[in-house]
């Protein structure tokens, strides 16, 4: 499709996905205005209720590479090589991400990267502005009128109470998050499906400061997890040698987030459930009270576009829970896929239709995968039988690397569509259920017999799980 042509496009939302997409559009020669309801993140505080740091992996890197900002982002990204599981007794178990000999990015081993949301957003906003995008902060989208004869018209409300009318525009992209104003307008159109649901669990963050010498208080190349059945604590390292710790727990019950609103109750709970953590918080109660409890919302909708005028991307199309570390990566993949479709298709309407068809099943799949991964991390990662299964799978991946690719690697270190990875993972689960049914599996798990039996099922076209 021919690029540019002087078309005026608007991006609603200057978060991570919106600023990346604005940058990509400018590189294609379009006139781009970005409207963001919040104040400029470079001058104002980060709003509460958003995770401080994020996990960046292959799907996200592809989008950053396409936009020409990967090198700048690598400077603020911290490699994370695997999970470090913490038992109640203080014992730890390290589980490596990826395949041992698989190459990663920038000469690093295969890993994920911890990045600051605020610093990444700043890089993307400034790159978009340098490329010529006009970014208007403090503009809350109040109305979207897509059906005018001359294009889309928008109305924005500013912090001072005044209103601004914009348009006509050729098309508008909704990258304005889980409570999208653009999607809200699409919901009033015919044959638009929408579902919103809150998880029964929420989260609360704490910042673990560096030690007295200015160093990390825990292993810095690992995602730390304290699995405790109905709840769990996670800690992700930051380049400034802090850790962002996040408690995921139900709202209800004696150890629920509602009960833990009392800082003394929260401190007693942490001392009981995560005793090895308490030494790293000299004033736990003060730190606990610095951060709000936040909810976890999930959004599904269909389609993700309307004719050639409106298109949803990122959380506006597919808000998911954070337990696979793929929310941002999925949003960046939206940008990559749509950019590739614009190269391939002959018109915006064809590109948008192909985008919805490709990304809707992927968005549904990564939501399911994230929910499954929460159960795995919370309930199973301390289970010896589950850990044995993972050791068998790792052995299969190492020995049959051209065939057996673990589900985590398919999701995190490949560009296999999420729904295809989910289907492959279900089949692998069925194979492993057969393998783990052997009464002597604990004694022969690393034998050739076990490996060959698993691969015989894997290679059989008749085995569908």
Predicted feature residues:
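Conserved Rossmann-like nucleotide-cofactor binding loop
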Residues: 17, 40, 179
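Short phosphate-binding/catalytic loops that engage adenosine nucleotides
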Residues: 30, 69, 133
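Conserved FAD-binding catalytic core of PHBH/FMO-like flavoproteins
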Residues: 126, 133, 139-143, 148-296, ...
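C-terminal helical "tail/cap" subdomain of flavin- and related membrane-associated enzymes
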Residues: 2-7, 340-465
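Conserved mid-domain beta->alpha element of the FAD-binding
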Residues: 11-27, 173-174, 206, 292-382, ...
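Active-site-adjacent segment of FAD-dependent monooxygenases/related oxidoreductases
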Residues: 44-127
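Hydrophobic "anchor" residues on beta-strands that sit immediately upstream
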Residues: 9, 32, 134, 166, ...
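Glycine-rich FAD pyrophosphate-binding loop
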Residues: 26-49
């Amino acid at each position: 499709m021919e690029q540019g042509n002087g078309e005026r496009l608007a991006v609603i939302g200057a978060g991570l996905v919106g600023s990346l997409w604005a940058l990509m559009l400018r590189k294609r020669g379009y006139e781009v205005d970005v409207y963001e309801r919040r104040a400029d993140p470079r001058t104002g505080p980060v709003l509460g209720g958003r995770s401080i740091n994020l996990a960046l992996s292959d799907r996200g890197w592809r989008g950053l590479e396409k936009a020409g900002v990967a090198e700048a982002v690598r400077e603020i990204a911290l490699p994370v090589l695997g999970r470090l599981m913490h038992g109640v007794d203080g014992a730890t178990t390290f589980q490596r991400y990826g395949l041992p000999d698989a190459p990663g990015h920038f000469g690093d081993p295969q890993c994920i990267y911890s990045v600051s949301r605020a610093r990444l957003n700043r890089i993307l906003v400034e790159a978009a502005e340098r490329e010529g995008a006009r970014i208007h902060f403090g503009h809350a989208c109040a109305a979207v009128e897509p059906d005018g004869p001359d294009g889309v018209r928008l109305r924005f409300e500013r912090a001072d109470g005044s209103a601004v009318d914009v348009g006509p525009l050729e098309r508008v992209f909704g990258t304005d998050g889980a409570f999208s104003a653009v999607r809200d307008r699409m919901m009033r159109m015919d044959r638009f499906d929408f579902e919103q649901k809150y998880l029964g669990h929420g989260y609360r963050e704490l910042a673990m400061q560096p030690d007295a010498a200015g160093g990390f208080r825990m292993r810095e190349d690992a995602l730390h997890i304290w699995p405790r059945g109905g709840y769990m604590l996670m800690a992700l390292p930051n380049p400034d040698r802090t850790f962002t710790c996040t408690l995921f727990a139900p709202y209800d019950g004696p150890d629920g987030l509602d009960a833990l609103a009392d800082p003394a109750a929260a401190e007693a709970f942490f001392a009981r459930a995560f005793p090895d953590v308490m030494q790293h918080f000299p004033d736990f109660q003060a730190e606990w009270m610095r951060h709000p409890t936040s909810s976890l919302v999930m959004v599904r909708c269909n389609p993700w576009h309307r004719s050639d005028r409106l298109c949803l991307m990122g959380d506006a199309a597919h808000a998911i829970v954070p337990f696979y570390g793929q929310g941002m990566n999925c949003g960046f993949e939206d940008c990559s896929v749509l950019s590739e479709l614009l190269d391939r298709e002959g018109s915006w309407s064809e590109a948008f239709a192909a985008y919805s068809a490709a990304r809707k099943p992927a968005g549904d799949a990564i939501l399911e995968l994230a929910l499954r991964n929460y159960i795995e991390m919370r309930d199973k990662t301390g289970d010896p039988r589950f850990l044995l299964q993972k050791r068998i799978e790792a052995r299969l991946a190492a020995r049959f690397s051209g065939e057996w690719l673990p589900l985590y690697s398919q999701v995190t270190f490949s560009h296999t569509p999420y729904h295809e990875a989910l289907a492959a993972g279900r089949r692998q689960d069925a194979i492993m259920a057969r393998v783990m049914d052997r009464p002597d599996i604990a004694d022969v798990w690393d034998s050739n017999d076990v490996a060959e039996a698993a691969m015989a099922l894997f290679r059989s076209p008749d085995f569908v799980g």
